[in-house]
Amino acid sequence: MKGLKNQIMKKTSLFICTLLFILSIVFYPKITFAYPFWAQQNYESPREATGKIVCANCHLAQMPTIAEVPQSVGADSVFKAVVKIPYKNDLKEIGADGSEVPLQVGAVVMLPDGFKLAPQERWTEEIKEETEGVYFTNYSEEKENIIIVGPLPGDTNKEIVFPVLSPDPSTNKEYHYGKYSLHIGGNRGRGQVYPTGDKSNNVVFTSSTSGTIDSIDIIEDGSYKVNIENDNGEITTEEVPVGPQLIVKAQDKINAGDPLTNDPNVGGFGQLDAEVVLQSPYRVIGLIAFFIGVGLTQILLVLKKKQVEKVQAAEGI
């Protein structure tokens, strides 16, 4: 009965996530492309064969991500994997409509096979408090070991706690005690490139040709059309969306690849690997027994030494 209930809850959560994704695509198509769940629709795995997490394909700027994972954990135990996504307080970025908006953050944690998001009934009160307002999603039904979060308001979520449940090799022979690797990614801010390959408005716009800027047209929505005349008298028009600020003016001479705008991006993506040891209880017991044995041996050696010293003293040596 409990298994059936968990299955129903899992399918309900997946349905809600899918529904939210579809609605966001319909009503906010350009905004949603910056969010972690877009990777779910385009990549079977969020990590490429090269080791790169696919979020870096859209979030081109690099910024640090920090992870805190315990060195070792017991079987069938709940532990915290903490992802820290640092950036300056009160930092604003350019939204899809060109206005300044607070940064949002997201994270992905790729756990080893067998590890997964801990069920809520096993969360401690501390974990419940630390994860309040955070919604965790499995990358897919088949990949319970890959968990994504976001977008979340960055000012209150620079540190995201992932409650993780370790496997129990004593009940499932597919898993073994030993050292395992985790792959972790953290992002702050919008991407620079959409999955379609088009630029967002959160990137530097450059000239595709050399020449002289003939004129700059300002469009009603605040975007620009920069008309560039080359040496042959041909006009090339570069479209700049609302958001980035122009750093050129009419009659400026430019070369292909020169920037037309500033760089509005203040965010970035970072990834790292971490390790955790799934500790066997028998190994712990053996280690304790070893230390006890070493301690007893040292005590016996000290006692033996004192005994020898007494004998030598009695014999006048």
From Swiss-Prot:
Segments passing through the bilayer: 284-304
Cofactor note: Binds 1 heme group covalently.
InterPro entries: Cyt-f_TM (IPR024058), Cyt_f (IPR002325), Cyt_f_lg_dom (IPR024094), Cyt_f_lg_dom_sf (IPR036826), Rudment_hybrid_motif (IPR011054)
Localisation: Cellular thylakoid membrane
The protein's required cofactors: heme
GO molecular function, one term: iron ion binding
A Pfam family it matches: Apocytochr_F_N
Gene3D superfamilies noted in UniProt: 2.40.50.100, Cytochrome f large domain (2.60.40.830), Single helix bin (1.20.5.700)
HAMAP family reported in the protein's UniProt record: Cytb6_f_cytF
Similarity section: Belongs to the cytochrome f family.
Protein name, UniProt field: Cytochrome f
Organism lineage: Bacteria, Bacillati, Cyanobacteriota, Cyanophyceae, Synechococcales
The encoding gene: petA
